[in-house]
Amino acid sequence: MRISISKVCLGLAFSCIVPATGFTEEKSYLCAINEVYECVAVTGCSRISIDDANLVGVMIIDMEKKQLRTAPLGGEHRADDIDSVAVTDKAIVLHGSGIKQMDRTWSAVISLETGNLTAGVSTLDSSLSLLGKCTAQP
């Protein structure tokens, strides 16, 4: 189950903050996941480690290419397309489905005021809730 959820990552994960005025104009963002919660039917939700969730803790959001990529930290390189991006006065809202054959979807919201990241990954039998921070990259 965790393997089917894995590698979506946001994460998000989405730790410094940048001013809101320039945040949406940047080309990419570095995001670190700080907390992960796994939720399943009957047993509910519990906090798990990034490793147990089989997630990468640091991701890059490339706004120009509309991709969510693993940070180049020596691990396996992955990139998932971002299906939709919406920018409001207060947030950047992202959505994607990763590998289509895995019956999963993910979404994320990044605060333009604080850089806080909240994200979720849903599959047929479970979901992950992710919390973290993002910062604009030069």
What would you call each of these model-derived segments?
Residues 20-26:
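Boundary at the C-terminal end of the N-terminal hydrophobic targeting segment
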Residues 7-19:
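Bacterial N-terminal signal peptides
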Residues 109, 117-129:
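Short, exposed beta-strand-loop hairpins at the edges of beta-sheets
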Residues 35-38, 70-78, 123-128:
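Short, solvent-exposed aromatic-acidic interface loops
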Residues 1-7:
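Positively charged n-region of N-terminal signal peptides that target proteins for export
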Residues 129-137:
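Short, low-complexity, Pro/Ser/Thr/Gly-rich segments in the mature regions of secreted, periplasmic
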Residues 28-66:
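Short, solvent-exposed loop/hinge segments that bridge or flank secondary-structure elements
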Residues 64-103:
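Contiguous, well-ordered beta-strand patches that form the walls/edges
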